[in-house]
């Protein structure tokens, strides 16, 4: 029996939730912090144009949420299949799912990148870029979009790694990527004088580092699953199941992107570019309070999937009860803070 099988199937639910959620929470908090630091560096690096530059980054946020929709749609859909397959001891199905996740996320990301590059300026105007902010938004978003596949691949496959119960390595991917970004930001923005373009390039490089770490994970003996190229041939059954499970998360993020579009347009009309910049900063600060809750969600997913696949429904129900108590307590604490 693999050590993660014993952990997911036998260890107490309370200990499991803490053990699997804590690394996810740490990684997500650091990631949220680097997003905030990114904005701070841009604000300090562009002098009188800083608010326009921050507004440009804020306008790009709905597009980044769409990128997240792709990553989470594939990641959550595929990881659910993987954890249930591991619970049933069906290693081949788990490996086929990992390979098909790669195929799906890369294909969709390339299509998304091509679409955005063709219609970038019209999209940015729809998302709230004024004529003054548009050059900053374009300069930043162009590079972010070019790096779409790096981001979505790293984020989606981190979910697959988490599905094995290896939340520590998934955390390491987020930590190393975030720290890389924080180190590169001042270098590109201040030392090279590249402004918002430098911030975007630093972000893309950090996402590429995440991709390299995912590749290393599957190439080494760290994963219990092999990434087999022959399995990357699309399996319609696995792809269909991945899409059907991940669709709700995908739609949720698309709707969230649409809401930010409406917010930005309203702020542009009634408050101007500075209001959009302030709103963008506020959202990034607010995200720090949400990350622990999202971390709990990520931590309990492999517990759900594995025990559901193993027909241990009592443990599934217990996980739901424990996680509900923890999340409720976190929400109360966040509200008080």
PLM ranges: what are they?
Residues 15-79, 247-268:
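Signature of the first transmembrane helix
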Residues 111-142, 333-337:
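Short membrane-interface helical motifs at transmembrane helix boundaries
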Residues 1-21, 203, 215-256:
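Interhelical loop/hinge segments that connect adjacent transmembrane helices in multipass membrane
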Residues 54-114, 151-170, 278-336:
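Small-residue-rich hydrophobic transmembrane alpha-helices
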């Amino acid at each position: 029996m693999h050590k993660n099988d014993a952990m997911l199937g036998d260890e107490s639910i309370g200990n499991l939730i803490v053990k699997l959620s804590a690394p996810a929470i740490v990684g997500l908090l650091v990631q949220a912090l680097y997003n905030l630091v990114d904005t701070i560096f841009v604000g300090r690096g562009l002098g009188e144009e800083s608010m326009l530059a921050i507004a440009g980054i804020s306008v790009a946020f709905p597009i980044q949420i769409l990128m997240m929709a792709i990553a989470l749609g594939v990641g959550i859909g595929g990881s659910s299949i993987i954890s249930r397959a591991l619970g049933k001891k069906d290693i081949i199905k788990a490996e086929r799912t990992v390979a098909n996740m790669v195929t799906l996320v890369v294909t969709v990301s390339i299509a998304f990148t091509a679409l955005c590059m063709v219609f970038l300026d019209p999209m940015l105007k729809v998302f709230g870029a004024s004529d003054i902010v548009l050059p900053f938004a374009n300069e930043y978003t162009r590079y972010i979009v070019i790096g779409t596949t790096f981001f979505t691949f790293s984020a989606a496959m981190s979910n697959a790694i988490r599905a094995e119960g290896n939340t520590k390595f998934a955390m390491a991917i987020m930590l190393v990527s975030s720290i890389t970004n924080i180190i590169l930001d001042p270098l590109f923005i201040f030392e090279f004088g590249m402004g918002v373009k430098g911030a975007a390039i630093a972000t893309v490089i950090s996402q590429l580092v995440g991709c390299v770490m995912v590749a290393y994970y599957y190439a080494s003996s760290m994963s219990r699953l092999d990434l087999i190229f022959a399995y990357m041939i699309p399996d319609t059954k696995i792809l269909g199941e991945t899409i059907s499970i991940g669709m709700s998360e995908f739609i949720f993020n698309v709707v969230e992107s649409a809401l930010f579009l409406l917010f930005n347009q309203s702020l542009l009309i009634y408050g101007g570019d500075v209001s959009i910049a302030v709103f963008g900063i506020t959202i990034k600060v607010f995200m720090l309070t949400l990350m622990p809750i999202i971390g709990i969600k990520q931590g309990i997913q492999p517990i759900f999937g594995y025990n559901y696949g193993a027909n241990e429904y009592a443990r599934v129900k217990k996980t739901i009860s424990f996680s509900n108590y923890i999340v409720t307590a976190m929400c109360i604490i966040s509200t008080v803070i």
